[in-house]
């Protein structure tokens, strides 16, 4: 954004505080501009209470001038996006091949959505299998205090951003085979423009890699998707630590972000009676204790995975399956009296679940349509509101359901999850497959995309796809060896160690494949029955 201006955001339009008449505004937009100007002059409020839209390549309203003729550079891979998946892909590519890579990104540092996430966010799953394959994240420690105590550490956002920066500065760039262009906008056809206005044309010898396809979004990236009346304070979670005490907090959204905000407020001694939680859908949650890697937890992990396969094999219907998964401890829910209809891979500890259950004022009336000073209007009706309440918008879709498309397509490659909700592992796996195999048909068979889940039935679809992919991978001894040693592979502990004799490994893997196949066949039957029931309705 140009020096001397602050954009007060509404929708996609920035508003000047100074010289604002230069924008061409509709009457409605002009009215909202005037209201926000009055907020600055008529009522003493903090700038932290006003949604700020900073300029930059993601929302810059001023086109950047091109500085001279376009420059030409050559590379093997042009990677668009330096988020978690882009970094994991590039790391494995550089580690396992002699390829050259050009990385471009809109942000000023690597890390993707982590660079704009709220300051108290942490990983929901262990640091031990997050990041890139070649470098550990964290210190491989067990938390001794807090609501994650007894489990593997969960990296906070600051550590994650520093980690990706270290991967770039200490590992990728020193190879001399990676060129990194931050603050750059991809223009298509191998062209991009930097912040300075320099335009580059990239000659790509192998593939253009789209590491942005899954489009992770956090609340700070966009305004609330519902109408908020003047005078009502509605903020993204990023602003929460900057604000003072309120007599009522209303958390809008029940996904991972909503749970994070509720837990942050409770951790800071806010009385649960002061919290209202707008929960359009209840969710099935993963017990974090069942996803713990390493020798300390290997027996528990194998037993938990086995219990999941047994529950699938014994289930007679969808409801029966979820009952069995809950009994086995695979899945949890906040309210035992409410049947969840959502599944988004959210992960909690038992201590966190106990805290969330302290919140009694839960509104289950669908999504918010608009917020007025004394009323919250939802899909299913309205509820009274406190004029002085602080609303925290947690409705951004951090894992949107994108349609599956071929990962390998001629000179393009589109990063997607090939294991459910394990994006960084998937990106590293795709990079390995890219150089380990020649034929794109074989590569695409190994890298069948798995769209992010949304509803309860998606747990079944995701698990069915996971089982099918895993079976295919285990057919290849070399790929099985790679899976056994990959740091990012959550399921590595299910495989026999590389130190075992080849025949022993083959026998164990073969037995495991049969169990996967049996569970996959049963899931297919349950899904067919559930689909038929849905169509009849």
UniProtKB/Swiss-Prot annotation:
One of its GO terms (molecular function) is monooxygenase activity. GO terms for cellular component: cytosol; peptidoglycan-based cell wall; plasma membrane. InterPro entries: FAD/NAD-bd_sf. Pfam families: NAD_binding_8. SUPFAM superfamilies: Nucleotide-binding domain. This is Uncharacterized protein Rv2000. It comes from Mycobacterium tuberculosis (strain ATCC 25618 / H37Rv). The lineage of its organism: Bacteria, Bacillati, Actinomycetota, Actinomycetes, Mycobacteriales.
């Amino acid at each position: 954004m140009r020096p001397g201006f602050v954009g007060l955001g509404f929708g996609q339009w920035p508003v000047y505080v100074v010289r604002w008449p230069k924008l061409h505004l509709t009457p409605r937009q002009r009215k909202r501009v005037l209201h926000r100007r009055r907020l600055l002059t008529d009522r003493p409020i903090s700038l932290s209470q006003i949604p700020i839209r900073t300029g930059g390549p993601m929302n810059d309203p001023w086109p950047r001038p091109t500085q001279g003729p376009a420059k030409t550079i050559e590379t093997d891979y042009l990677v668009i996006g330096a988020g978690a998946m882009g970094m994991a892909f590039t790391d494995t590519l550089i580690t396992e091949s002699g390829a050259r890579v050009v990385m471009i990104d809109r942000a000023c540092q690597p890390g993707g959505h982590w660079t704009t996430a709220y300051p108290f966010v942490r990983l929901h799953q262990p640091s031990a299998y997050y990041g890139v394959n070649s470098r550990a994240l964290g210190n491989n420690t067990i938390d001794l205090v807090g609501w994650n105590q007894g489990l593997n550490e969960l990296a906070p956002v600051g550590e994650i951003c520093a980690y990706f920066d270290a991967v770039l500065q200490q590992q990728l760039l020193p190879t001399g085979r990676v060129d990194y262009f931050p603050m750059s906008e991809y223009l298509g056809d191998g062209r991009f423009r930097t912040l300075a206005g320099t335009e580059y044309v990239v000659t790509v010898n192998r593939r253009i890699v789209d590491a942005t396809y899954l489009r992770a979004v956090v609340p700070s990236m966009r305004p609330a998707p519902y109408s908020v009346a003047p005078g009502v304070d509605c903020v993204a979670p990023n602003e929460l630590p900057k604000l003072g005490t309120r007599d009522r907090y209303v958390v809008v959204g029940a996904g991972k972000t909503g749970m994070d905000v509720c837990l942050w407020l409770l951790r800071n001694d806010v009385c649960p009676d002061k919290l209202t939680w707008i929960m359009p859908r209840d969710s099935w949650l993963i017990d974090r204790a069942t996803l713990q890697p390493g020798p300390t937890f290997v027996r528990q992990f194998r037993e938990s995975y086995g219990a999941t396969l047994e529950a699938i094999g014994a289930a007679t219907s969808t409801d029966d399956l979820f009952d069995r998964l809950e009994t086995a401890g695979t899945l949890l829910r906040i309210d035992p009296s409410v049947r969840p209809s959502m599944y988004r891979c959210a992960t909690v500890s038992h201590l966190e679940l106990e805290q969330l259950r302290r919140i009694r004022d839960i509104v289950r009336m669908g999504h918010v349509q608009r917020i007025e000073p004394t009323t919250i209007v939802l899909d299913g009706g309205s509820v009274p509101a406190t004029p002085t309440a602080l609303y925290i918008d947690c409705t951004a879709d951090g894992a949107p359901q994108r349609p599956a498309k071929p990962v390998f397509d001629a000179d393009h490659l589109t990063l997607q999850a090939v294991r459910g909700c394990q994006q960084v592992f998937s990106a590293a796996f795709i990079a390995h497959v890219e150089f380990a195999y020649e034929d794109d048909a074989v590569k695409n068979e190994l890298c069948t995309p798995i769209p992010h889940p949304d509803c309860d039935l998606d747990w079944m679809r995701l698990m069915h796809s996971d089982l099918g992919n895993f079976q295919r991978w285990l057919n290849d001894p070399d790929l099985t060896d790679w899976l056994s040693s990959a740091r990012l592979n959550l399921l590595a502990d299910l495989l026999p160690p590389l130190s075992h004799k080849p025949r022993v490994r083959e026998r164990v893997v073969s037995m495991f494949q049969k169990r996967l196949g049996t569970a996959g066949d049963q899931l297919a039957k349950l899904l067919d029955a559930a689909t038929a029931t849905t169509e009849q309705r």
